């Protein structure tokens, strides 16, 4: 394909109609270098001001030389370029988060409203297959979106309908680490896909077709349920369990950066069914608020965050909090380590007591206020006591009492341990 063909596609799709400034994520690979060439050549036709952004991951000897070459390229094209260096322990997830945080900083600094990436159809196939193998939710198998609004910016992926073989061979940098199978995506690209294509030579097309079909269903359900107020629990619970799940998943699409896991989604469902009033952080700066027959999910305001005085601990993580070291699923060594059976399926909330708190003991629900009175706990200790909560229920009041589930229930639900060590403040 020729460059004008790509321009015509961009114009037909109207990718940049709403944008005057766009930031291009420039890695130096063939796909991003060709996208740079098309966008820089046709800035006038597309009516955009182009800004370049590059992250030097510092993982290869060639990285610094490539950075210098990209600076030269930007200077020759008379385009601004912003560069940041990755630091810390490297992983695919950390590098991705670092890149997108940096790109958003560049956009704020320059006033750009669009972030353009060079993801193409081959990336889409790899992404869908990765998510399928990991067992992600069905709606995420639609893959990467062509256009995606996140807050006040729009991410545009104009190459998503093209394969890498559609791009002409132009000057670019080859990342030799892509040939290694250390990372999951590389194993998908180098090993799994070639084997699957032996069984079905059109396997890539089949995967893309499934992704598009799931996207169609997702959009259709959103349109058909547009007049249903999912936040009205009386209305939501009037439908079958299956329909409730689908409606709730569609509702969660309103929050693209929330990304609940299956276990977290199940936890939200359980809270909506079992709690009359509830207010807790759930993930990525969002909180779930339930008041009788109504609920909502919204961003936590700084004031609300301070009032909650709460920490959320995820599986395989540790945190020092209020004089204790909490380790979720990672054993601690020592003679004074407290161990509490918990589930690895969802996060743990560590907080202070709230009005209406209840602990289940011997199958009976007991208000914390009454428990503290019965145990003659001093007021100062009541106010400083740390509550450990999971699945919306109190698991333990640290150093005071625990939820003594039956042995069978413990075996069924509790499949890991929260380790707690007293430390100097």
Swiss-Prot record:
<comment type="function">
    <text>Ligates lysine onto the cytidine present at position 34 of the AUA codon-specific tRNA(Ile) that contains the anticodon CAU, in an ATP-dependent manner. Cytidine is converted to lysidine, thus changing the amino acid specificity of the tRNA from methionine to isoleucine.</text>
</comment>
<protein>
    <recommendedName>
        <fullName>tRNA(Ile)-lysidine synthase</fullName>
        <ecNumber>6.3.4.19</ecNumber>
    </recommendedName>
</protein>
<keyword id="KW-0547">Nucleotide-binding</keyword>
<dbReference type="InterPro" id="IPR011063">
    <property type="entry name" value="TilS/TtcA_N"/>
</dbReference>
<dbReference type="InterPro" id="IPR012796">
    <property type="entry name" value="Lysidine-tRNA-synth_C"/>
</dbReference>
<dbReference type="InterPro" id="IPR014729">
    <property type="entry name" value="Rossmann-like_a/b/a_fold"/>
</dbReference>
<dbReference type="GO" id="GO:0032267">
    <property type="term" value="F:tRNA(Ile)-lysidine synthase activity"/>
</dbReference>
<keyword id="KW-0819">tRNA processing</keyword>
<feature type="binding site">
    <location>
        <begin position="27"/>
        <end position="32"/>
    </location>
    <ligand>
        <name>ATP</name>
    </ligand>
</feature>
<dbReference type="GO" id="GO:0005737">
    <property type="term" value="C:cytoplasm"/>
</dbReference>
<keyword id="KW-0067">ATP-binding</keyword>
<keyword id="KW-0963">Cytoplasm</keyword>
<keyword id="KW-0436">Ligase</keyword>
<dbReference type="GO" id="GO:0006400">
    <property type="term" value="P:tRNA modification"/>
</dbReference>
<comment type="similarity">
    <text>Belongs to the tRNA(Ile)-lysidine synthase family.</text>
</comment>
<dbReference type="Pfam" id="PF11734">
    <property type="entry name" value="TilS_C"/>
</dbReference>
<dbReference type="Pfam" id="PF01171">
    <property type="entry name" value="ATP_bind_3"/>
</dbReference>
<dbReference type="InterPro" id="IPR012094">
    <property type="entry name" value="tRNA_Ile_lys_synt"/>
</dbReference>
<dbReference type="GO" id="GO:0005524">
    <property type="term" value="F:ATP binding"/>
</dbReference>
<dbReference type="InterPro" id="IPR012795">
    <property type="entry name" value="tRNA_Ile_lys_synt_N"/>
</dbReference>
